[in-house]
């Protein structure tokens, strides 16, 4: 399910088709953002005058040490995941479709602070997280069918070691953030790591949650010479090429061309923001799809990891990662990279 044999002539045909789709959808009004109520119509958020535990956005992540690993997954499972986690909000103008059969595991260790004038005075909070990222195409629903509108990164699961981050992420954006503890890499150039959770190996009326190893990323190979990047453009071009080579063949040439064009844009994150009803436990009192922009502020260093890494996932009833993401309990990565950078998670849009 890859497109590694796209030739130069075919590539330009695909790009031309994408430009045609974009132009048609633009002039028909399909690519316009839907009208949303003004934010000043909402009541003020009551926080007692202090931003803890839920800071005001936007949010600066600085001194970020990041490692990313790409793994093959079952695209049918990823489709089901998007359908039950994103495509259930009736007010959303989009249907999110996995772009490939790949999942990216991202480890990040950083300092997080608010860029809001008031909350920026609080300071920075250390945070470590491990999450899974799925690249999707947001298909806009129109009276004439669906048209590709933009790309979006879906983060179905993120584990974090800091409580304020969990509260802010879940409440503001709808991050599915859960508590975890980590053994961190000694240095980001050789990112061996583990993640533990409070969980259940098996559910049962008498079962008691305890600390369990959820996953491990390791390599038995010795550290090898790495291909480094001197600027963010080089990083972006590398990952854009890998994304183009991994697009599902059943997407068709028009979608492939659209993706080639869309990769030059900033790709937002997408979440399902919801709250369980207090009066009807099986219902949601609030449910919206949220998209939020993520922009690189400063890039310092980065390189592709030359050695292979193995992901080991422990089967837990409370955290069925392999089952929900279409991963194997043990598998080797397709590629990996480390980065040192700062980035900003901006204010989102609720649909």
For each of these PLM feature ranges, what is it?
Residues 31-33:
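C-terminal region of N-terminal signal peptides and the immediate post-cleavage residues
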Residues 52-109:
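N-terminal ordered "arm"
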Residues 12-29:
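N-terminal export signals
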Residues 93-151:
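Extended, compositionally biased
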Residues 35-36, 41-52, 164-351:
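Interaction-surface and assembly-scaffold signal
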Residues 1-6:
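N-terminal secretory signal peptides
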Residues 136-185:
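Hydrophobic alpha-helical segments and helix pairs
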């Amino acid at each position: 399910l890859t497109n590694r044999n796209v030739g130069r002539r075919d590539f330009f045909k695909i790009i031309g088709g994408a430009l045609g789709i974009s132009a048609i959808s633009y002039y028909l009004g399909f690519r316009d953002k839907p009208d949303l109520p003004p934010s000043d119509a909402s009541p003020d958020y009551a926080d007692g005058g202090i931003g803890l535990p839920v800071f005001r956005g936007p949010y600066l992540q600085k001194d970020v040490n990041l490692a990313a690993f790409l793994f093959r997954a079952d695209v049918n499972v990823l489709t089901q995941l998007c359908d039950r986690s994103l495509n259930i909000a009736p007010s959303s103008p989009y249907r999110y479709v996995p772009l490939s059969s790949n999942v990216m595991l991202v480890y990040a260790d950083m300092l997080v602070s608010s860029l809001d004038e008031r909350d920026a005075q609080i300071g920075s909070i250390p945070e470590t997280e491990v999450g899974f990222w799925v690249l999707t195409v947001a298909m806009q629903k129109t009276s004439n069918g669906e048209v590709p509108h933009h790309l979006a990164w879906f983060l179905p699961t993120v584990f974090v070691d800091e409580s304020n981050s969990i509260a802010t992420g879940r409440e503001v954006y709808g991050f599915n953030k859960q508590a975890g503890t980590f053994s961190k890499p000694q240095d980001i150039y050789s990112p061996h790591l583990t993640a533990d959770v409070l969980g259940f190996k098996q559910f049962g009326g008498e079962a008691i949650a305890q600390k369990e190893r959820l996953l491990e990323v390791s390599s038995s190979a010795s550290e090898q010479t790495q291909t480094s990047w001197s600027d963010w453009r080089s990083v972006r071009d590398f990952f854009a090429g890998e994304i183009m080579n991994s697009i599902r063949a059943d997407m068709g040439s028009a979608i492939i061309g659209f993706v080639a064009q869309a990769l030059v844009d900033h790709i937002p994150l997408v979440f399902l923001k919801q709250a369980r009803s207090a009066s009807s436990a099986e219902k949601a009192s609030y449910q919206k799809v949220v998209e939020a922009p993520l922009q690189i502020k400063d890039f310092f260093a980065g390189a592709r990891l030359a050695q292979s890494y193995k992901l080991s996932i422990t089967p837990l009833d409370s955290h069925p990662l392999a089952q929900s993401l279409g991963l194997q309990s043990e598998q080797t990565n397709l590629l990996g990279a480390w980065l040192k950078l700062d980035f900003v998670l901006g204010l989102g849009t609720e649909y």
